[in-house]
Amino acid sequence: LRDAVSQSNRIIVFDVSGYIDLKSQLNVSSNTTIAGQTAPGDGITLRYYTLYFGKSDNVIVRFIRSRRSQVKDVNDGADATWGRNRKNIILDHCSFSWSIDEVASFYDNKDFTMQWCNITEALANAGHDKGAHSYGGIWGGKNASFHHNFIAHVQNRAPRFNGARYNWSGYDTNLYQNSIQAERVDFRNCVMYNWGSGNGCYGGPGGGYVNMV
């Protein structure tokens, strides 16, 4: 799998099912489709490291599970999956959990969709420098759609909308003149369940237009 995703212009299918024990972060290249639905039986589960989209545009990932856990390489950025400053990404029928930081964070992306996914069971005390954590994710972007997702069993950020935080004046770049231009999000038909004593679904600084249904 690592060899396949390290090169662009790939459609990846599976002849077998089971666990893939990652030895480092899995970086997905551009112009890639990972068709997890082609795996027989119980499908494909990635373990121990992050599924990362920070270097990829034009990507489709379907029916993949990512279980980060604290078994290896505990660090403050250990999400089950994440990516920002990318475009044209679809995550469909995936399941993400057991993160040290956030389960699934996607913001500052353009033309992004996460649909029919499970974002659950962020680890509470897994070695994060800030102590107890257990966060669902930071979401947002320009023309970003989050629909029919299940967010459950996290302490906080279920999710947190903060999606234009690095694409307006005052942060990394001046791609847009302000946060209102930088963010347009559609959030609908999602279920948020069993968040902890922190905030459930809420907004942070650097936000723009968010449609919640």
Can you annotate each of these PLM segments?
Residues 1, 12-15:
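Solvent-exposed adhesion/ligand-recognition segments of exported proteins
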Residues 2-8, 19-35, 42-63, 68-87, ...:
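Extracellular beta-strand-rich solenoid/capping regions of secreted or surface-exposed proteins
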Residues 14-17, 37:
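Acidic/polar N-terminal loop/beta-strand segments that form early-domain functional surfaces
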Residues 15, 105, 160-162, 201-202:
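A cross-family glycoside hydrolase active-site/sugar-binding cleft signature
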Residues 31, 36, 57-68, 85-98, ...:
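Right-handed parallel beta-helix
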Residues 47, 77, 100, 133, ...:
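Beta-rich catalytic cores
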